[in-house]
Design a protein with these regions (language model features):
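A short, proline-enriched helix->beta-strand linker immediately N-terminal to the Walker B motif
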Residues: 147-151
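ABC-type ATPase nucleotide-binding domains, specifically the catalytic core motifs of the NBD
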Residues: 90, 94-109, 118
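Glycine/charge-rich catalytic "coupling/switch" loops of P-loop NTPases
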Residues: 260-307, 324, 328-398
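Internal alpha/beta loop-helix hairpins
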Residues: 179, 189-259
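Conserved ABC ATPase "signature" region
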Residues: 59-64, 107-124, 175-176
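Conserved ABC ATPase signature
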Residues: 128-132, 136
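ABC ATPase NBD coupling module
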Residues: 61-78, 102-105, 109
Length: 398
């Protein structure tokens, strides 16, 4: 359990944040200057807030009303920055063990071999940081943090300095960290794609205040948050499970409360949990059950909300048997199809809208049936864009 209440003024900027999380990975999302780093620094004890109460588990780290402020070196919080900040004169092994030297023996948790195996860095132990890629440096930094036996892991935009390939390399390890260690994580990011993939709890900040906080799947589908999250990235996340694979066509069949989805083949075993991200711009709407489509995914649903228009565009929120989806349509399509709250419709999603490159790679993820992944990170690049443009249009859809 993580409980955070912070009120603090930094010059002209006022931070006023209050949220709670049951564990897992809590993502702090917002634009630059929204207060994310100030908030995580308050949790770490790097700043002393004007008024605050911060509790991790059963330990109070800060409570200004009771004059409690645990110094940062006694908080047992590990902090991972944008850059790995490894010691250049030490090997990877020595960097990993550095934090452990300063941890009391009775507080030490985590086995060296298990941490090394989980992060896939066994072959790097004799190297020095200068010979590591950006993704490798961050994996070593995560390992060093874990071996310091923290009660809380803080990650301040750890992927911001990495290119897309290195991000794809390290994301599965953060997923494993979230799922296998049971260590509460606070993760700062301004990337909605990272948040959609990783977050258990999502906290959205805007101008120093919390605009929304709660389970990630619920917060992601709030239409009023599009101006903060960015309309091109607006979408939903759906928890699914792999049913089977279609070797002949290179597809994987997923089952969710909303129905079945077919996506490009995932290298995960049947029964694995998969988190699917569906962007609003990739959802078409039909008022009758469509036939003769190239799109393989058709989900029945009911319109529960029509958001305010922005120029010619508006967004709809659908309830698909308990799963929420968002669709972005023109106001002309909404008028032509006579769409309104309570109207039964069909959401149409092309399989090629789910980019399998955003799924965790290889056996690292396949080892656990509880691994979650995200598809649909870069939906319309390369061949995917060409396929979308050349496909037959869906009848009665925007």
């Amino acid at each position: 359990m993580l409980e955070v209440m912070v009120r603090h003024r930094l010059g002209d900027f006022a931070l006023d944040a209050n949220f709670a999380s049951d564990g897992g990975l809590t993502a702090l999302f917002g634009r630059s200057g929204s207060g994310k780093t100030s908030l995580i620094n308050a949790i770490a004890g790097l700043i002393r807030p004007d008024h605050a109460r911060i509790v991790v588990g059963d330990e109070v780290l800060t409570d200004t009303d009771r004059h409690i402020f645990v110094p940062r070196h006694r908080r047992r919080t590990a902090y991972i920055f944008q850059e790995g900040r490894l010691f250049p004169h030490l090997t990877v092994r020595q960097n990993l063990l550095y934090g452990r030297w300063f941890t009391r023996p009775l507080q030490r948790r985590g086995d060296f071999t298990q941490v090394v195996d989980m992060l896939g860095i066994g072959h790097l132990l004799r190297r020095r940081p200068a010979l590591l890629s950006g993704g490798e440096k961050q994996r070593v930094a995560i390992g060093r943090a874990l071996l310091a036996s923290p009660r809380l892991l803080l990650m301040d935009e750890p992927l911001a300095s990495l290119d897309e390939d290195r991000k794809a390399e390290i994301l599965p390890y953060i997923e494993r960290l979230r799922d296998e260690t049971r260590l509460p994580i606070v993760y700062v990011s301004h990337s909605i794609a990272e948040v959609a993939r990783l977050a258990s709890t999502l906290v959205i900040l805007s101008e120093g205040r919390i605009a929304a906080a709660g389970p990630a799947a619920e917060v992601m589908t709030r239409l009023d948050l599009s101006p903060i999250t960015g309309r091109p990235e607006t979408g939903a996340i759906i928890e699914t499970r792999i049913v089977d694979h279609d070797a002949a066509f290179g597809l994987t069949r997923l089952r969710a409360a909303a129905g079945e989805l077919r996506v490009p083949r995932l290298e995960l075993p049947a029964g694995s949990k998969v988190r699917v991200r569906v962007r609003a711009r990739d959802v078409m709407i039909a008022v009758r059950e469509p036939t003769g489509l190239s799109a393989l995914n058709v989900l029945p649903g009911v319109i529960t909300e029509i958001g305010p228009s922005e120029g010619p565009i508006a967004e709809l929120r659908l309830d698909c048997r308990g799963d929420a989806l968002i669709a972005r349509l023109t106001r002309q399509s909404i008028a032509t199809l006579k769409l309104s709250n309570g109207r039964k419709v069909y959401a149409v999603i092309k399989s090629v809208a789910f980019d399998s490159r955003a799924v965790g790679r290889g056996s690292d993820m396949a080892k656990s049936a509880d691994v979650e992944a995200v598809v649909a990170e870069d939906l319309f690049s390369g061949a995917t864009r060409r396929d979308h443009q050349s496909a037959d249009p869906a009848p009665a859809a925007d």
